[in-house]
Amino acid sequence: MKGSRIELGDVTPHNIKQLKRLNQVIFPVSYNDKFYKDVLEVGELAKLAYFNDIAVGAVCCRVDHSQNQKRLYIMTLGCLAPYRRLGIGTKMLNHVLNICEKDGTFDNIYLHVQISNESAIDFYRKFGFEIIETKKNYYKRIEPADAHVLQKNLKISSPGQNADVQKSEN
């Protein structure tokens, strides 16, 4: 049997419906039309993941200038349940990390994860992400509503820089 192929492809107006469908199945939250309109504008920061030519997952990010930093925000990164633990999430996250590395100007990369999603938390921790805070009632209409903010620092900060970021251990 031939080895399985995992490939990443661009999100385009022709396949945006596939992305919508994947997100509806994978995530307990729904995304509005503006989300999908914005995704079409971010180029390499949004990718569909294919397993043997079947769209099974996606990653969508955006550049965020907050806290006087240039940050990459992972809006969504997910894969259909039957295709998990095959390296698809790793391929998507590595794609995003490589973009940040090549760019060289990002301070950090961050995302929100539902506090009950232990497999996602473990996944991101393997890549050097840390829980930096927990936001109460972050999600609407899903339980638990709280979200961890996971962050991976990309720049070696000089002493004193980022001293205002509170680390919370959970």
Swiss-Prot record:
Q: Which residues bind substrate?
A: 31, 75
* Xref: SUPFAM superfamilies: Acyl-CoA N-acyltransferases (Nat)
A single GO molecular-function term is: protein N-terminal-methionine acetyltransferase activity
UniProt entry keywords in alphabetical sequence: Acyltransferase, Cytoplasm, Nucleus, Transferase
Q: Name one Pfam family in it.
A: Acetyltransf_1
Q: Which residues bind CoA?
A: 79-90, 117-126
The record's section on InterPro entries has:
Acyl_CoA_acyltransferase, GNAT_dom, N-term/lysine_N-AcTrnsfr
Transferase among keywords: yes
- Catalytic activity, EC: 2.3.1.258, 2.3.1.-
Please indicate which superkingdom the organism of origin belongs to: Eukaryota
Q: Which PANTHER family would you find in this protein's record? A: N-ALPHA-ACETYLTRANSFERASE (PTHR42919), N-ALPHA-ACETYLTRANSFERASE 50 (PTHR42919:SF8)
UniProt similarity note: Belongs to the acetyltransferase family. GNAT subfamily.
The protein's name in its UniProt record: N-alpha-acetyltransferase 50
